[in-house]
Amino acid sequence: MSRRAPGSRLSSGGTNYSRSWNDWQPRTDSASADPGNLKYSSSRDRGGSSSYGLQPSNSAVVSRQRHDDTRVHADIQNDEKGGYSVNGGSGENTYGRKSLGQELRVNNVTSPEFTSVQHGSRALATKDMRKSQERSMSYCDESRLSNLLRRITREDDRD
């Protein structure tokens, strides 16, 4: 049973990828050169054997270098086009919608009724947060107690 079927996934030893995982040269295909798809392509490359520690220790450095080069390549292309596109550019996600932070920003911040309301609600929120922080324990006490709890449970487990 040491020989595998010729059609099996593992028969080739993992060398039948269209691009090897340590091929660090910047790609020129449209999927990774487009800054909108850059997040997808780099996270896709991280999957597989690299996330399960099946490769030697120095190969993680090589694959990380490749991801950086891919990002640099996309940035260079944006500069050649004359900056980012008007419709949001790299800030947009895959479906062309802006991310939540950009969506919530108001274009005209100088309108007086908006700024006064905004600062008022922000001030109220911080006041409430201060009240709730005064009631709770300090971080030092919390961490001390959690360490004690851990130690006690370890001692209980030993017995």
Swiss-Prot record:
Transmembrane segments: none
Region (Disordered): 1-139
Skewed-composition ranges (Polar residues): 9-31, 105-119
InterPro entries to which the protein is assigned, alphabetical: SMG1_N (IPR035175)
Domain of life per record: Eukaryota
Biased composition (Basic and acidic residues): 65-82, 125-134
Protein name, as recorded: Putative uncharacterized SMG1-like protein
Organism whose genome encodes this protein: Homo sapiens (Human)
